[in-house]
């Protein structure tokens, strides 16, 4: 959230953040963080309050939940605002497995949210876990098409899948739109900064809200994230400190 909010603000998007879990740090590189859990009742209460006050949303972005018990309350929240576009990043794993604090039951809980997603934003690992497809570091176009079609059948209207090896560059970004796959070839940098996905998502959804196509939006998101990674490496920033976005926010104005 700390990477997304500045991005949205700079791009002229007013955000209304609703926390699902509060952590003293992210879950990688700082040991066990202090955690404050948000109750399902709070999420539902927010929805009821906004409805009472006639608050409207152009888009609802669903990101890190951290607790499978929140899935039903998130569905309730979405149902209260049927005119909003729903974008869902099912944050739960990478490198072929669940993050250490999640398991298959968490994945099943997140599956319940797929039907409400106008746009689903998993990485390759998350797309395999949700589709029930064996993960591999190299997947053919046929494999990727099957994964996309499975997620589409589960209810996702459109997909953008990140961290996809395609045999020509180390990681690409896949767009699945109207039954067609488009690959954006990217160059991989030798670092994995925390918060990269949040920055990518922020630029992506802001670009969509400003009227850009999905392809244009993901190109702009990648351009910004790549520049931030270059700056972070240049400054010899620790990966656990997260992606350094501040010096590149001007790119989004």
Protein language model features and the residues they cover:
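Charged C-terminal helix
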Residues: 215-253
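Glycine-rich beta-alpha junction loops
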Residues: 21-23, 66, 92-94, 126, ...
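Conserved N-terminal subdomain of the carbohydrate kinase-like
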Residues: 1-100, 246-252
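Short beta-strands and strand-loop turn motifs
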Residues: 59-62, 87-95, 121-130, 161, ...
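Conserved phosphate/ATP/ADP-binding segment of small-molecule kinases
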Residues: 101-181, 191
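Short, small-residue alpha-helix embedded
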Residues: 129, 191-214, 218
């Amino acid at each position: 959230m700390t990477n997304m909010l500045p991005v949205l603000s700079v791009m002229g998007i007013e955000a209304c953040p609703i926390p699902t879990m509060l952590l003293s740090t992210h879950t990688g590189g700082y040991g066990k963080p202090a955690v404050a859990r948000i109750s399902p009742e709070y999420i539902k209460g927010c929805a009821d309050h906004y409805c009472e006050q006639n608050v409207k949303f152009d888009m609802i972005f669903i990101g890190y939940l951290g607790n499978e018990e929140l899935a039903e309350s998130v569905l309730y929240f979405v149902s209260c605002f049927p005119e909003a576009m729903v974008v869902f990043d099912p944050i739960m794993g990478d490198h072929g497995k669940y993050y250490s604090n999640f398991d298959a039951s968490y994945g099943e809980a997140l599956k319940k949210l797929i039907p409400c997603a106008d746009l689903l934003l998993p990485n390759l690992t998350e797309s395999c876990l949700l589709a029930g497809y064996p993960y591999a570091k190299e997947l053919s176009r046929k494999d990727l098409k099957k994964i996309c079609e499975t997620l589409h059948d589960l209810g996702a209207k459109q997909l953008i899948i990140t961290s996809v090896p395609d045999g020509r560059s180390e990681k690409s970004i896949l767009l699945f739109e109207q039954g067609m796959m488009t690959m954006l070839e990217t160059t991989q940098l030798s670092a994995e900064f925390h918060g990269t996905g949040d920055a990518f998502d922020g630029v992506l959804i802001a670009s969509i809200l400003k009227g850009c196509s999905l392809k244009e939006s993901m190109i702009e998101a990648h351009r910004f994230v790549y520049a931030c990674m270059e700056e972070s490496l240049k400054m010899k920033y620790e990966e656990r400190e997260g992606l350094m976005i501040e010096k590149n926010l001007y790119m989004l104005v």
